[in-house]
Every structure is written in structure tokens, then in C-alpha cells.
């Protein structure tokens, strides 16, 4: 039975008073720590309300306007993301008030079983699972998805070709960008237009966004955290005197206002020549090689090195591909060394590559 959110007032033993302020510490959530140590993010009720306003609008307006033919309300949402991940927490807080069912899958090994038991229309996911669903589609095994049709993905960029094929086969794929430090509030891509498939979308209208002179995304508004727990130095490094939160993510914006993530500021390889190289840019080019399972680009002895995980019998094919990639690059961006690994590259619980 659905009850109004203020129904507790009917049975309250006395007059209700506010016990905390909107800007008091409400919760601590930790960053993923892919490029350094994990930090505790202090968040307030004001931060939460600013973010949930955006995601409730998404649930009520955007997704519902794209219902497949014959689909009835209310919808149901599944997440495999852990509850300590901000994207999962936002889903838990946003969708039930809109009347949606919320399905939680506790173990990715049970994904197809749980999807069969709990029909889900929409799913919040990491890139690796979207790739799995894409492979199911390619193999003609869409029926095992039990009607799942909308995929919301964050954490890392998806291959535009894969996104286009999913869209052409009836899926709605939404890339989005957000951070723990902004209570998940960020940039949302609602378009299914081919030329914008690789964008993370347009910024939330309720928050201020800008790209600084280096191309770093900066955010200002009620969603920005109180600071890092017991770490005023780290807080001062990312929140400037004017209240702008410097995300550390680099992006470009096209003439229509769509943002495209180009890399992480901390990941930039700074060569002795003074040139800056984005490893993510090179990794995207290498990922086009069918023989490469995983790769990561890093600096080693002032050289650009690619660490590649692939079958041993494909190594010569990969070397030849790297040569072709280098021919398309300026001299300072070229990959000087290739290392092969027999083990998958280390990732965190969210599937992000660890660069430490």
C-alpha cells in the first residue's frame, strides 16, 4: 500500500521539531579510490534534496515518455551496483517515491536468475554489464533479459558503435556523469541521436557548470559536498574560494551543449617536453582492436607504455595494430612500449580500472 511520505505525522506522539539543519552532516560515503586513497565525502540533507530533485524528474518525465508500445505503468528498476555506490543510493531514494518497484540483485552471478524472477524495465549498471547485454543481443538471446529495455550507465564511456546498435534494436541507453562529491548530480544524456551517442549529455539545469581554462569540469550549487571527512587540505584542493567544485575530469563541449569526457586530470601523462597526453584517448583507440581484451596506458621512464591483456597467440596482431595507431598520432602521443600481461587488469568493485 502506498502512503504519503508525511503519514508519520498522524501517529507522532507530540509536536515534531527539526532535529538537524539542512546543512548538517547527514551521511558519509567513500570515493572509489581508483587513482589514490579513498576519501570520506561529507554530505548534507541539502545535497541530497538537490540531487533527488533531478533524478525524480528523470523517472517521472523522461523515461516514461519513451515507454515501448504496450508497456504499462508503474515501472520497475533493477540495480546491480552495491549500496555503497552513489548511483545505487540515488536509485533507492529516487524511484520508489515515483511509484516504481526497486529490484536489488546482490550478486552478478545471479543476474539472469534474478532478472527472470523480477521483471525490470530499467537498470542502473556499470559498462561491463552493458557490454554483456550487447553480446546477448548479438547472439539472439534477448529473451533472457525478460523485457529489460532501458540501460542507465555511468563510471566509464561506452563504445558509440555498441550504443548505436543497441538503440537500433529497441534499447534506450542513457550515459550519465556524476560524482559522490555532488551526490550523483551531474550530466545526463537523454538523446538517442547517433552524433551524440558518445556524449555524457547536457548538464542539470538546477546546477551551475563550466569548463575552466584546462577543460576541467567545475560544478557549483546545492549538490556540492560539505567537504572531505577530517581532510581540510584535500577539500581546499577541490573547492575554490568561489564555491566551485573542481571535479578532476576533463571534457569538451560541442556547439549544442553536449559534454564529452576526454580523461582524468590526474591521469594525464606529462612528458619531459611539456606535452600532456590523455591515456584514455589512447586506450579508446587501442580498444578498437578485436584481439585486445583489456588495456591501460601509463607513463614509464618518460615514455608512453601500453599494458595489454590479450591471448598469447594474438600478440603479434596487437603489435601490428599499435604501429597503425601510432601512424595516426602526432609524435609526442605515440606509444613507445608495449607490455603484455597474462592476467586481467586489476579493477575495483565497480569494474573501474585501477591506475595506482
What are these regions, as identified by a protein language model?
Residues 115, 121-125, 133-195, 208, ...:
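Gly/Ser/Thr-rich phosphate-binding loop
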Residues 1-22, 137-139:
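ANL superfamily adenylate-forming
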Residues 11-30, 36-37, 66-76:
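Conserved pre-ATP/AMP-binding loop-to-beta segment of ANL
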Residues 341-356:
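Flexible lysine-rich "adenylation lid" loop at the C-terminal edge of ANL adenylation domains
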Residues 202-205, 212-238, 258, 275-277:
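Conserved ATP/PPi-binding loop(s) of AMP-dependent carboxylate-activating enzymes
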Residues 221, 226-227, 250-333:
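AMP-binding/adenylate-forming catalytic core of the ANL superfamily
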Residues 26-53:
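Conserved AMP-binding A3 loop
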Residues 49-76, 83-148:
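Conserved AMP-binding/adenylation subdomain of ANL enzymes
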